[in-house]
Amino acid sequence: MARRNPLLFAIVVTILFVVCYGSALIAQTPPPVDNFVASAHYGSFKKRHGKAFGGDAEEGHRFNAFKQNMQTAYFLNTQNPHAHYDVSGKFADLTPQEFAKLYLNPDYYARHLKNHKEDVHVDDSAPSGVMSVDWRDKGAVTPVKNQGLCGSCWAFSAIGNIEGQWAASGHSLVSLSEQMLVSCDNIDEGCNGGLMDQAMNWIMQSHNGSVFTEASYPYTSGGGTRPPCHDEGEVGAKITGFLSLPHDEERIAEWVEKRGPVAVAVDATTWQLYFGGVVSLCLAWSLNHGVLIVGFNKNAKPPYWIVKNSWGSSWGEKGYIRLAMGSNQCMLKNYPVSATVESPHTPHVPTTTA
């Protein structure tokens, strides 16, 4: 997933908004942060998250990152009237570069996405006109999980999709094993990144479509290590293939409505300080993180996608983020994929396994 220099990122953002908004940007420029105010917020942040640092140099580095993030949150709030960014979240003492390195799988998408083979599936049936769907309410979404310090978002996205497709097709919801993919999938790179369709391809080619339960093969890579594959566990679900969906939000919404959750890749660079609400300006340039669409609401103002993340339930809206529909926020429509599952309750869907 793509790494970016934080200084370059700040310069590009500034140029972008000067070009787009001209003199209006002057009123939105973050004001200087008073050290006394920043210290008070920083003290509350450390207490809330149990943070303690060993020396003055590290303490100073964290405080400076926190102070800079206060300005970043202010700027993002001015651009997102329906969302809230804040420094009370657990990532507020990280620089943008540190955050990207730890949670956004640097460089992987840039190196591998060009090899992504599209096999676009188009559902020719007429749209139903359904305005809102939430698969959490339909019992097709497991609780929010936490990838930890491992760059395994791709595994959580792929497994979340399979969990959702399995339950949406009429089977009982079961939590499946991300660790099976992280440790055993030799197409992808464990904690160093992967792609959701590659993971599904490995499941089909090397695992006969079978996925182990989380209970029988629990996640152990939260510290950033990749234990050897032991390839033993209880089969909890079985897929018949996978496919790429059209890069079109209406088509993605149709799939979510009729079939269930969809795995997507996004640019999550600005998610570091997200606290809640609907993001309507994401500032996205390149894909770097895998997540799961579990629903949408077209009746809301603005209409939004419901997206499940894998940074634990203390991040965002209990582990979720809402992105405005219709404007490709965070590049959400650029890489939608889904596994397919046989079920007597749904018609057969053409699949691809390569």
Swiss-Prot record:
Protein name per its UniProtKB record: Cysteine proteinase A
Gene: LMCPA
PROSITE patterns noted in UniProt: THIOL_PROTEASE_ASN (PS00640), THIOL_PROTEASE_CYS (PS00139), THIOL_PROTEASE_HIS (PS00639)
Removed propeptide positions: 25-125
Coiled coil start-end: none
Lineage: Eukaryota, Discoba, Euglenozoa, Kinetoplastea, Metakinetoplastina
Biological processes annotated in GO: proteolysis
Source superkingdom: Eukaryota
Recorded family membership: Belongs to the peptidase C1 family.
Glycosylation: residue positions: N208
InterPro entries on file: Papain-like_cys_pep_sf, Pept_asp_AS, Pept_cys_AS, Pept_his_AS, Peptidase_C1A, Peptidase_C1A_C, Peptidase_C1A_papain-like, Prot_inhib_I29
An example molecular function term from Gene Ontology annotations: cysteine-type peptidase activity
CDD domains for the chain: Peptidase_C1A (cd02248)
EC number: 3.4.22.-
Keywords noted in UniProt: Disulfide bond, Glycoprotein, Hydrolase, Protease, Signal, Thiol protease, Zymogen
Pfam family of the protein (one): Peptidase_C1
Hydrolase keyword on record: yes
SUPFAM superfamilies, sorted: Cysteine proteinases (SSF54001)
Annotated organism of origin: Leishmania mexicana
Annotated S-S bridges: C150-C191, C184-C229, C282-C330
